[in-house]
Amino acid sequence: HGAGNLGRQAALLAGLPITTSGVTVNRFCSSGLQTIATAANYVRNDGADVVVAGGVESLSFPGGGGSMQNNDPKLAQQYPAIFMPMIDTADIVAERYKISREYQDEFSLESQRRMAAAQQANKFADEIVPMATKMKVVNKETKEESIVDYVVNRDECNRPDTTLEGLAKLAPVRGEGKFITAGNA
């Protein structure tokens, strides 16, 4: 999002001294997880006493991460697959390894159920730091917008009311004959 070295900015905004280093890791969907693995490596192998790790992935504002306009034309010509969107990769893998749409929907449903049960049991309470923010609320009837104070204290992207029937009704993103939908991606 044009944030430059976001890791360094976060360190400074957290009140750490200017002598504190910061590293930004971009791995799209798994950047946060990768930073934790990298931090563990610094502690285990490099003798670091303290390392802070985190991620800023956003499903509501993903940015333009993989758009072709940001890719080197020579690389795109020589190795087009490295710029392939994940949705296309997932469809190819499903077709190649004969992973049916039905199986993917069943797997997704089970994942949703497990997430709902974990949230109900507060399994992530020690791992998610509540974050105060502002949220834009749009009235669906009047379209009136307002900004409200809000605390994010849990993953809000899961759908605990998901059903197999609902998943089956979703059209594949890349069209008929493909596998990946908004519900099983």
PLM segments and residue spans:
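Active-site-proximal alpha-helical scaffold in enzymes
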Residues: 27-56, 94-123
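Glycine/threonine-rich beta-strand-loop-alpha-helix active-site module
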Residues: 46-75
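Short loop/turn and capping residues at structural boundaries
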Residues: 22, 54, 62, 105, ...
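Short acidic, glycine/serine/threonine-rich loops at helix termini
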Residues: 3-4, 61-67, 142-143
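Conserved catalytic cysteine-centered active-site region
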Residues: 1-49, 69, 80-88, 160-185
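A glycine/threonine-rich phosphate-anchoring loop and its flanking beta-alpha core
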Residues: 65-102
